[in-house]
Amino acid sequence: MGSRCLFCFADGFKGQRFKWARANNRSGAVLALEAASLLGDRVTKLYLYEPPFIINDSRKPVPADYVQQLNSLTEAGKRSEAVEYFVSEALGIPDEFIGYMKADPSWNKMKDLSHTLAYDGLIMGTTQSGKPLPTNRWVVNAPTLIMTGENSEPLFHDAAQALVKLLPKAAIHTLGGQDHSAVITAPEVLAKTVVDFEL
């Protein structure tokens, strides 16, 4: 979703106020940041789970031509290859595990949706380039809680630390015993945090 489309969407909610609870393993957190920037003070609180920013050498950055390569594979009808490229380059899954993923029935479902993977890349923009986050992309004054899992990879903790420095009313809360899959494996833990944690 481009910024123009997102602005039209956000503009449709004039006069309404929101407490946004957005937990997502990929671009959903960034999309929530974009929406909160556009909606301004109509967003009263914002909750994010592990925005997957790559801002240093904690893992290999996503290639600069990532979106272009995804589109090329999809347009050529190479849907499985597009999913494999996404899993390898964006998610950072080692090659030795991808074969097991292909054997799972969910791989075919991912193939059916492979044409949408480029949208994810467009939303992420340069936030996975291995460079510092842009300082002027988001203007969010709402109290923001950035959640991380205790057992998650360092990149997610580094990303949270970088983002909390950019948002004036942001805080970090680490969920004990959780990792990046908590959105799927422990949604009740995230929900309780959203309900209980006062910003």
Model-identified regions with their sequence ranges:
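Active-site loop/oxyanion-hole signature of alpha/beta-hydrolase fold enzymes
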Residues: M1-A23, S27, K192
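Post-His helix in hydrolase/transferase enzymes
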Residues: A159, V183-E198
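Conserved serine/cysteine hydrolase catalytic core
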Residues: S106-L166, A171-G177, A182
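Helix-rich cap/lid subdomain of alpha/beta-hydrolase
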Residues: P51, I55-N108, Y119-G125
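Alpha-helical elements of Rossmann-like donor-binding domains used by nucleotide-donor carbohydrate transfer enzymes
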Residues: C5-D11, Q69, E81, Y85, ...
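Short, well-ordered alpha-helices that flank and scaffold nucleotide-derived cofactor binding pockets
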Residues: E34-D41, K165, K192, D196
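Structured catalytic cores of enzymes that bind and process phosphorylated ligands/cofactors
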Residues: M1-G2, A23, V30, A82, ...
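Conserved hydrolase catalytic core segment
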Residues: G15-K60
